[in-house]
Amino acid sequence: MRLPHVLQEQFLSLARPNTLKNIETCGILAGNLKNNVLTITTLILPKQTGTSDTCSTENEEDLFEFQNKHDLLTFGWIHTHPTQSCFLSSVDLHTHCSYQLMLPEAIAIVCSPSQTPNFGIFRLTDPPGLDIISTCRAERAFHTHPDKPIYTDASDTGFIEMINFDVNVVDLR
């Protein structure tokens, strides 16, 4: 999967007003498949609500309409952790599970501007992570999961290639 180097910087710039208020911001990573390569070409910020440790999209039909009109596939999502470290919370794991069930290559990017490291690219392991999260029936938003390697840093696997090209930014908020 190819990601533009400027993605994090542009996303954090758009998220900055929320980050200063300790509110998470999320975006959708979209692009195209050409010659067996997934390329993220577009960052879409949908209408959303956020708190200090969650963000949720709203009016998803606007997002789907935009992607359909521009022939964009969904390759994952990106969000901030304004004051937390760079990891996938239990809520993030469940959010990402739906993306990875639809597209096994889907990624989740976490930006933690006040921490080091401040940027991570993650995927659920398969096995065991995808099975564990997809069958989890815990009712509380934040909860524990078995102490197993549920997700991994996708940038360490050679799956991600960060290259220099522009990303189209669409703010639907």
Where are these regions (language model features)?
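Conserved beta-strand-loop surface patch within small alpha/beta domains used
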Residues: M1-T74, T83-R173
